[in-house]
């Protein structure tokens, strides 16, 4: 875990995290208190969202930063996200995304080729 994230996580949630799958093919890493709030919201989704509930809730695993600031991701989650040697950790506000570097590059290439979604039409840089 990079120092800038490790220090915040150690102070905000005592290094207690929850990791789960994301439909885009990465892993979501939440501070445990933020995950508990998110988990309740996911559990209340309508029946039509059962597949998403299974993905997010059924894959969720509680982990902790070790004394060296590392996290151990189990083989099932590593395989689901295609995590190989090179990984990228992206800060996304209240959570982090953990990507296989090659998968992220391809995902970004496709997203840029498709252009901004209509919902971001008013966004300016």
Each language-model region and where it sits:
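Short, solvent-exposed interaction modules
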Residues: 37, 43-78
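Conserved "turn/edge" positions that cap or connect secondary-structure elements
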Residues: 116, 120-125
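Acidic (E/D-rich), amphipathic helical modules within compact regulatory domains
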Residues: 1-40
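Short, structured motif recognition centered on aromatic/hydrophobic residues
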Residues: 1, 29-30, 69-73, 77, ...
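A short beta-strand-loop micro-motif that forms or neighbors metal/cofactor-
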Residues: 11-26, 82-99, 116
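A short, polar/proline- and glycine-enriched secondary-structure boundary/capping micro-motif
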Residues: 11, 39-42, 83-84, 108-111
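Short, surface-exposed beta-strand-loop junctions and turns on beta-sheet-rich folds
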Residues: 7, 35-37, 79-80, 104-106
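Positively charged
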Residues: 26-33, 97-117
